[in-house]
Amino acid sequence: MSVDIDTVKRVARLARIAVDEEDASRMTGELNAILGFVEQLNEVDVTGVEPMTSVIPTTMKMRVDEVTDGSKAEDIVANAPQTEEHFFLVPKVVE
């Protein structure tokens, strides 16, 4: 895949970034170099390689999944202007 100057300008416009002709031309080369590197990475055979999230083997700390009410209902609604039975009262928006 290669990027042309029109694609760079279109992406810049979508991202709301001001890019002049000189910058667009420079970015075209840079983006093509990046995409070339990604294509090289796609050629690497990773068959049998487990995906990893860290270079050091780690395990996530697990906790018991217990359903609770949080025991903080009073604290949560303490600063609300209007409440009823631990619920926020808000003005009706839709008729």
Swiss-Prot record:
Q: Which domain of life is it from?
A: Bacteria
Q: Which InterPro entries match?
A: Asp/Glu-ADT_sf_sub_c, GatC
> Which reactions is this enzyme annotated as catalysing?
L-glutamyl-tRNA(Gln) + L-glutamine + ATP + H2O = L-glutaminyl-tRNA(Gln) + L-glutamate + ADP + phosphate + H(+); L-aspartyl-tRNA(Asn) + L-glutamine + ATP + H2O = L-asparaginyl-tRNA(Asn) + L-glutamate + ADP + phosphate + 2 H(+)
Do you know which SUPFAM superfamilies this protein is assigned to?
A: Glu-tRNAGln amidotransferase C subunit
Q: Which residues pair up as cystines?
A: none
Provide the assembly information. Answer: Heterotrimer of A, B and C subunits.
What is the name listed in the Swiss-Prot or TrEMBL entry for this protein?
Aspartyl/glutamyl-tRNA(Asn/Gln) amidotransferase subunit C
Gene name, Swiss-Prot/TrEMBL? gatC
